[in-house]
């Protein structure tokens, strides 16, 4: 069964390549995290997985309150391992 994606209007704001930087590390298995994201409704903490990272940021996969999947690059300081 496919997981619905979060519509762009409801998705978290994501950092761009110039902000998150390089090199990008992609683990064999994602790491469980809690992270702060910013959406049009404000800031909120989500649980999810870090699927990639750089020295400055992490790309997280998370589910919103409706069970829809989203991805966002966020600053490393906004992420904690669970």
Where do the protein language model's features map onto the residues?
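Basic/aromatic-rich interaction segments and small domains that mediate binding to polyanionic partners
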Residues: 2-76
């Amino acid at each position: 069964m496919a997981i619905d994606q979060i519509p762009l209007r409801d998705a978290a704001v994501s950092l761009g390549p110039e902000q998150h930087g390089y090199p990008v590390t992609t683990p064999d298995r994602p790491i469980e995290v809690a992270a702060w994201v910013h959406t049009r409704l404000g800031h909120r903490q989500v649980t999810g997985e870090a699927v990639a990272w750089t020295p400055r940021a992490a790309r997280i996969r998370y589910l919103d309150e409706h069970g829809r999947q989203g991805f966002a690059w966020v600053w490393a300081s906004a992420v904690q391992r669970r």
